[in-house]
Each structure stands twice: as structure tokens, then as C-alpha cells.
Amino acid sequence: MNFQVEPPEKKKTKNSSPPHSPPSSSSPSLSLLPEEIVVHCLARISRLYYPTLSLVSKSFRSILSSTELYATRSHLGSTEQCVYLCLWDPSYQFPQWLRLLVNPNRTLANSIIKKRRKKKKTTGQMLVPLTSSKFTSVSKATVVVGSEIYVLGGPVDSAVRVLDCCSHTWRDAPSMNVSRMNAWACFHDGKIYVMGGCQGLKDEPWAEVFNTKTQTWEGLPEPGSEVRKCSIDRSGVIEGKIEFGNVNEMCAYDTKLCKWEYCVNKSAALRSECMIENVSYGFWNMRLLWYDNDIQKDYWKRLEGLESLDDKYMRNGGSSGNTTKLVACGGKLLLLWEGYMKHNPNNRKKIWCAVIAIEKCDGGGVWGIVESVDVLYTVPISCQLLHCLVVSV
């Protein structure tokens, strides 16, 4: 998980030593090392320190923005999971993308906070807006591919925009064959599958697939009227099948057999479903549930230990009608929701975030431990939490 850590302040003493003189030209410097070694050194450092390191020199700035550095981070296994949010206010043309930083020093010690009421209470998380957000459109169809976020379509659009989460810059990818609005997308085995959103025209491919290696689009077989009419509010990849639908019906596309399936009276994957150590977690009916994929014919069970979170969720505007997102990051669950009350004179609402640690119990059970619950952002009541995505960089 990505963390923001501030170094402790050093206490000043009366007999403090005079400031050190600037290093001489003969002092050892990292910049004197071969660039390959510098890249390997920087690749082992958390990305949180990169903005400060970029001030050292132009050569450092060049290395910190290079693709070689992030390739080295991946090779060394030093990548970090980062959370990205997308907020949209209908009064603005473009959505706002933000990066979420989580503080590891925020613990369960609420009693310690109460004992130190004289000190200013600091939040465990913070959101950092990306300045390049205006280069993308509003779209439901977003997928994570490596260290990039693909935004597909928009208000009846075929364009595909890609956010490079290493440099926080946007680029264009090949456009879809069909303009789509409110489409759904999934990533599986190097390919992006896009479904729906094409205004129901039978002469247009209802679904198509994008090969991220060859950067080419290809239409999928005609799914039939039942699949076309299916109302989609969730999607996911299960055992090589692209599943989508709602609580009453489920459709699927078998990527190996290139075949469509339709099942009535069968629910699709839960909303905001994610996985930690082969245990699936989902949010449904204002409850966190879990499902062990290693147990055949297992069933969804309530995640225990979250009574305090349940109470805080309800007291701070959480409801079945509000947007709630659940993601897994760094072995923990992050639950985000829009919280606003009916009586709100300022027409504002808050974006909340709860960090939940997972503990496996004897006998195969799973327990949740609430580490922190914080307000991330205060936004106009018309603003919507569109996406919450986890990217490894």
C-alpha cells in the first residue's frame, strides 16, 4: 500500500552545534555513480519521496520520470499499490482524478488520541488531485492494466484515454469500433472486454475486445436479445468468464469457447468485489461479506468485527442509495462511501474512507479489524464518486 510518512521533527537544544558547512566537491555523491546503479537505488525507495528527490537535480528528475525506473521497480518486486479515485460534478465538463495516500502510523489507538486532545488530530489519509484530469471524459468503463488506467468511451464516444500512473500523464489509445455510453469493461488475460452502451443498434457490435499487446480492437459474436436487454450494474471475471448483470439475472462470456451465456434468477458478482489471499470480499445490503474460494460450494458470510464501522457508516450518511466502493490494497480493505444527510443547509457531502485489516482465525474464519475511519474530501452534494481503482507502480 502507498503510505505518506512525515519524518519526526528534531528537538532544538540550547547548545546546538553550528550548521554544517556545505560538502566539498570531493564529497561522495549519488550522481557520480553510473546511471544504472542510480536507477537501482531509486527503485528501492518509496514513490512518496520522489517529489522531494526530483528537486535534487535535472538528472534526477529525468530518471524519476523514466520508464526504466518503473521497469526496474517491477523487476525488483518493489512496486507499491496506489489507490486512485475519480470524482465528477455535473456542473463541470471534466471529472477530477485523485490519488489516495494512506498513513501507516494511524492505528487503533483511539484511546491515545483521546489522551492527547491538546494536540491537533491528523487524518490517516489524504487525497492529492492530478493536474492532468481535464484530458479525460466521464465514463463507467474503466480498467487497470499494469500501471495504467484505461478510460473507455464517455457520453456516446468511442475514444480511449490512458492514464500512466507512473508519470500521471494521459495518452490516446486506438478508439473503439463503436461509440458507447455507460458501457461496462473487464480486463482478463491481456485483453479488455467492453460490453453494452451502444444504444441498442443491432447492426453494431454489442461487445468488443481490445488486445493490449497488439493495440487492436475486434468485435465479439452477437450475444442475442436476452443478453442485450440485460440490465448491468456489476461485472467481474470468474474462472475465465466475463460475468455481468444484476441481482436478478446474470450473463457471461466464455473467453475460451467464445460463447455467451444467460442465466435468470442467478445473481452476478457482488458490487465492488475484490480479493485478498484467494478470499473474495464484497459489499451488499450495507454489509461486508466474504467468500473462501478454496472451499468448494462455500457461501457468502458476514465479515465479523465491524460493529463500530457499521454504526459509523449509518450515522454518517451511508445507505443503500449512496455510492459505496470496496477495494483491496496492501492486504487490507478500503471501504469508501458518500455521506450526506437529508438536512444539509450547505449542500455539501463528505467522502469517507475506512481502512480494515484482515485476520484469519482458527477454523477457517475471517475477522475484520477497523484501523481508521476518516473524511477524505468534502464536495458539493451534486458530486459523484465514480471510480476507486488500485494500481501497482
UniProtKB/Swiss-Prot annotation:
Keyword Repeat: yes
Sorted UniProt keywords: Kelch repeat, Repeat
Gene3D superfamilies in alphabetical order: Kelch-type beta propeller
Residue intervals of the F-box domain: 27-73
Signal peptide: none
Record SMART domains: FBOX, Kelch
Segments of this protein annotated with the region Disordered: 1-30
Kelch repeat positions: 148-190, 191-237, 239-272, 273-320
Domain of life per record: Eukaryota
Record bears the keyword Iron: no
PANTHER family (UniProt xref): (RAPE) HYPOTHETICAL PROTEIN, F-BOX/KELCH-REPEAT PROTEIN SKIP4
The protein, known as: F-box/kelch-repeat protein At4g19865
